[in-house]
């Protein structure tokens, strides 16, 4: 057999001439008429030879394609998928690791699936135009929620508890807002200010805060005042609602995420009453709807009272009660009063029902914190709990209450005639001083109002403000707040919002900064100012914040004029000191002091500032 006969021939491609067998004499190859470029060679393959792409689509006989190789594993060797299902004993698979995230850090999927009931998603809020104001980015600290523990005094537990949010990374707060029958006094506004500080601290710690503060715009007192003044009831509420908002804004309180009015949620109230009646916790009588207090075990647990010892008198028009302690959720209409249609006849809502229904709508069946003044514990908050739990809601997980502002030992109240209106206070005192005065005591401590304590607050804040101004002038620009507050400040705030202890850290840092100024240590003074600004920013007291800088700017022109006049007098004093005429120098200083100016001698020369009132 010849060599050519023993070599198998390649199959010919259909439609082309067969290739000669290996070893046979090749025929003469025609010479090309030109030398093709590399690109031409790629486009001009030899006739009958498939391109590389064709080879992929038509693999050689008996040779599996690359994709087939993956499916055709060697016998007895498990596929990669099988390996995932059979890990080494004691070693978790990658999927298990995803399901077991780090402690306190929610998985990405969990965040998406665990929305707060009743609260629209971010996309829904943006489309509906109901998105609340955003907390300033300056308040967002370098901490991630779950890495720190904030502790709060829970009225229902009667002890300080570690705060554990319902949804990791989020905190939901409902604050009982104003009943707008009159303009606000400083006792009213303290509650909003205390919870503004709470909200700012949660935001600094990295939480996404939803803050709801309602407006009670229908009430017995509003109706009574409207009748006395011969005005529409709604005009009373609207006028005083604006006064409250102006007061909150004047004292630097951040706007709430939602601020619902009671009259805008009658539908939700009717639904809650219907559910309570169906569950046997409420009943209708003579057009009124009452809550049956004996139907709910645990009623009065918040205020720690005994139901059998409770004596709650009925109000006018509340007829048909099964028990005198049953409270009205809905009041039958009376001539001349506003009313709404319900399945039980026309009427208007009771005070307690309003908050239960609005909290359910905006924060869902369960939320984190319910707040208000201590005077609301009973009956208002107690009855809110009864309605919500009777409806099937878990309701608030923590109850936080602020103390009163008193005058001569009595709670500040318009009915007692001892109230001081915010609108009058801001005419006599800088609003930032009023914020300092109301916000710096612990929220559970009573504030006894006096002019003397206000002057002390003004003097204390003036020392902080003076330090900020001196270092800013030395630096030649506004020093940015530090990225984090000092650890001692954070520790105080984490412990039941210990503002007094936190402010002690602020004043200590100010003293350190003043010492650095006296030693001509600019870098240390600037570093202390950065820390002070970070701490004051959390408390809403930063003098360089836009809220207060505007008021400072208004007085700058006047300050320059006064500064020029004072400088003339100080130059005379310096001349007397140079001549060692100490009597004249002291006399000038004393005269300036009688005018309300404080003179401070420093290595850079004399400085002046306004003294306390």
UniProtKB/Swiss-Prot annotation:
It is an enzyme of class 6 (ligase). CDD domains: CysRS_core. ATP binds at residue 414. Zn(2+) binds at residues 176, 355, 380, 384. It catalyses: tRNA(Cys) + L-cysteine + ATP = L-cysteinyl-tRNA(Cys) + AMP + diphosphate. Keywords: Aminoacyl-tRNA synthetase, ATP-binding, Cytoplasm, Ligase, Metal-binding, Nucleotide-binding, Protein biosynthesis, Repeat, Zinc. HAMAP family: Cys_tRNA_synth. Monomer. This is Cysteine--tRNA ligase. It comes from Streptomyces coelicolor (strain ATCC BAA-471 / A3(2) / M145).
